[in-house]
């Protein structure tokens, strides 16, 4: 949790599937910059399972508990502060489920590199992994069922499935203002399939923002590269890498802040760090 002394809004952050357990570490630079700009940042960790509906409910409960604690401890006022959702990859899907299923009030959602693939594509060898996890249990069950000529469906999918997720968003998603960010070098991004679904509800409030970078750009940190006493070819490569990665990350940060506050006024602030519970 990052709390500036005079917060202007709250940002609830949810990360990707395999880094969502430690968002404060994986996304440290980006989240810290949001805190410096005056935003309370609540980064909610989660363990990935096939039941995305349950994860969405859990992270929402955790977020609401943290906000209540901050208000109780007077770290933030109990008055109105707008709340924004910020998600990366699977975190986007979770925010979309929260906005579709649980009637939350949000000033808007920022969805970075949205991913809604089925198990087989979202997780390398996902189908085989799921099969192996249940093989021992199913082996005995299948033997028993065979004598009754019953069959067992060994296909596994997220809950809700990609198709069910799209239907939920189309029919029940209640957050009208959205920023969709897609990176130029991201082969698993599905922002373009999400965009028309959201446009059906409030096209004038859906902002599409293509940016240079790849699926891992939000995880980047500013690279500190010190050259030696003599400038070498390795130093040249290091400086180029630092410049390229830093520019993509800083551009992402700038677009997020511009959308959050179009007036371009971002107050500098010291932030207090506290672990989320």
Residue ranges of predicted features:
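Primarily recognizes the serine-hydrolase "nucleophile elbow" in alpha/beta-hydrolase
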Residues: 76-163, 170-171
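Phosphate/oxyanion-binding active-site loops and adjacent basic polyanion-contact surfaces
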Residues: 22-26, 51-59, 248
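C-terminal catalytic-base region of ester-bond hydrolases, centering on the histidine
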Residues: 135, 139-142, 156-277
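Short acidic, S/G/P-rich loop/turn micro-motifs used as interaction or catalytic elements
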Residues: 17-20, 49, 91-92, 116-119, ...
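Hydrophobic/aromatic beta-strand patches that form the interior of the parallel beta-sheet core
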Residues: 12, 42, 84-86, 108-110, ...
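Alpha/beta-hydrolase active-site loop
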Residues: 50-79
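Short, surface-exposed "cap/lid" segments of acyl-processing enzymes
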Residues: 1-48
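Short, surface-exposed basic-aromatic patches at helix termini and helix-loop junctions that form
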Residues: 31-37, 61, 100-105, 198-200
